Amino acid sequence: MLFRSDILKDASATAIYGSRGANGVILVTTKKGKEGKVTLNYSGTVTFETLHDVTEMMSAAEWLDYARLAKYNAGSYASATPTYEADKAAFGSVTASWKNIEKAWVNGVYDPSLVGSYDWASHGKQTGITHEHTLSASGGSDKFQGYASFGYLDQKGTQPGQAYERYTLKTSFDVTPVNWFKMGSSINASYSTQDYGYSFSKSVTGSGDFYSALRSMIPWTVPYDENGEYVRYPSGDVNIINPIRELDYNTNQRRTFRASASLYSQIDFGKIWKPLEGLSYRLQFGPEFQFYTLGVANAADGINGDGNNGAQYKNEQKRAWTLDNLIYYNKALGQHNLGMTLMQSASAYHYEMGDMRATNVASSDELWYNIGSAGTLNSFGTGLTETQMASYMIRLNYSYKDKYLLTASMRWDGASQLAEGHKWASFPSAAIAWRMDQEDFLKDISWLNQLKLRIGMGVTGNAAIKAYATKGAITGLYYNWGQNESSLGYVPSDPSQKEPAKMANPTLGWERTTQYNVGVDYGFFNNRLTGSIDAYKTKTDDLLLEMSIPSLTGYVSTYANVGKTSGYGIDLQVNAIPIQTKDFSWSTTLTWSMDRNRIDELSNGRTEDVNNKWFVGEEIGVYYDWVYDGIWKTEEAEEAAKYGRKPGQIKVKDLNNDDTIDANDDKKIVGHTRPRWTGGWSNTFSYKNFELSFFILSRWGFTVPQGAVTLDGRYMQRKIDYWVAGTNENAKYYSPGSNGEGADAFNSAMNYQDGSYIKVRNISLGYNFTPQQLKNLGINNLKLYVQAMNPFNIYKACDFLDTDLVNYDNNTKTFGSPTTLKSFVIGVNIGF
């Protein structure tokens, strides 16, 4: 139902939305009915999706070489070279798995090519098939226009046990019963069911999804013995549990119903009484609802069940609404045009939840529908969150000859989640524009179609913290009295808990960002070359972030206005039609953007906050650690010893050259979460009825916090270049087992990878049938197309991750992915 979306980047435009414009504004225009005969449209796609490995794992023989070295260095493998006896002692505790190693020992000689292996990962992926169908109808008269669509999506995931099904209903109508009044609505509703698949929680190896757990199994191990019996610990390690049967013992289902609406009515007073011409009133109301349930059942025979049937049932309800009252006044006085908008807005958000988790449920076949039969109720709880916001705004517009444009606004927002006395803030904005192409001295330039200069300033606010975050929460704590007696008490916080309460902040207020921008919109050569150039500068005061604090306070974090930041950026867009003939055309769009930010001031006059990785003069979102400088070589043994190191271990830089490595003086910023720049290039080629398009995306100069490994010879390992004395001393990674069964002391120094990439996001080929081809079928238009999604990378700096799967903002980060998804789509659009 999406018709188009517009991104507002101008400071004045985003400031109109106050706190809601803090992260930019995207205006979404949905499809509506049009005056005329009723039209019927169908669109359908079938998508084939496959899961591909990006990270290459060790083979069975490679893993054995690595594990032997790790165990030898740690003192638990008896020989510097492989022997049957040492292998038997180290890897022979499970007979069924040991046979894959034993077959490589022929007449007392080890042949790595004969090591047997089992393809665990093949059980964890499949071709995902999705089919989606949408049927829509629209039409109307001069007094009524309507639109309705129904959609259905069915998806089989790329991993067994994953599935998703969704129904959608969308309607909109606009009614004009008399020329001075109109009303309308847009309503969206959806219901979905998701089989989430298995999520491990018991074993070290099993953490994560089903496929990842299978890939984490050591390749020479087997899931079943020669009698077909399940092997729980294939390598003999109690932390590496065989996950192959888990889909039979676990259910994880989520159901969601969503509904939202946008309702309006508008009165044009000028059409009722001529002296009020230009005055109108609009009432808008937008309710939203969401009902969500989560059901999890773990059978006793599975890993998560671990001997007891377990169940969880959680439900959530979210309700929100926004009510806007708007008064518009527009007046033309000769070549002068004046406009004024007054707005009063109120919004509210309500969230409630209930969650129960239990073990010793009577039967896993009853899923989560009989938790009352549980022998142990592990946890139960309910919760309520409510927030409100009130807003007022005045905006003035002025234009002269449609060449000189001025906009000014003031908005006031009040947010309930902020502290008393700090809930309200004002957000002014102003902008001017000059349509230079309308000037007499430029009108006669034939190749100039548009040239517009824009200058703006605006203030936006951010109050995005959890409700009640300014108030101190209390935490339940059981006190023991002797051996058999305890009582429940409450304390402000317990830092030892998994999620301790945050310290109250009774002065928490708005984060305010002031932005200045200048931009140019242009169009040349009959608009065959168009685009825009925007530059902006920002300054943020009272930055609103979660801040770590010393646990000796009784807390570990609090929300705080921590300081000031500044930033700047450039956005470029170029649209061109280089070729346009009768049968062939080529259109292309190139976008490029960069932004920088800097911490100018921290609270309490500090210049750095190492715990939060905040440093005055540096960006928000940095990585601060040791600086990797290679691996100590054998001939460097004497030098390494000065630092308490030995050959085969990680070398880090002694930044202050004091012959000591310490955290206070030898760490520095080693990476940034945000890319130095982002670019995109889209192209569409049309030849007669055929259409070919592709899109390329690039993000450059950002850091992915992945790569550090624990080389203890215990768990499955990706293929790496590790240090071996005398034979591979120029390796990137340290010698396995060089720190016993633990990771190297400076292992984190290897945890930062360049995430830069250039990727082809999609390629599409379509055919549009002509009216002459369709005239005997009763069809107005027909398009068939195929599309490849995520087909390949042109370049990527990190060879073991898909770094396109990285999200970032000022305060959070996620990791790249060891797998990537590729899709092939077949689609059809039909109009009647």
Ranges and model annotations:
Residues 131, 166, 172-191, 197-202, ...:
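Extracellular/periplasmic, surface-exposed regions of secreted and cell-surface proteins
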Residues 1-170, 178, 182-184, 188-190, ...:
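Short, small/polar-rich motifs associated with maturation and membrane association
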Residues 120-125, 245-252, 381-382, 665-671:
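Asp/Glu-centered strand-loop micro-motifs enriched in Gly/Pro and often flanked by an aromatic residue
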Residues 104-111, 492-501, 536-562, 589, ...:
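Surface-exposed, extracytoplasmic segments of Gram-negative outer-membrane nutrient-acquisition systems
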Residues 113-120, 378, 662-665:
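Short Pro/Gly-enriched beta-strand edge/turn motifs at strand-loop
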Residues 41-111, 355, 469, 476, ...:
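Conserved small-residue
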Residues 32-40, 206-210, 463:
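Short, charged/polar, Gly/Pro-enriched secondary-structure boundary elements
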Residues 56-58, 298-300, 356-359, 605, ...:
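Short Gly/aromatic-enriched secondary-structure transition segments
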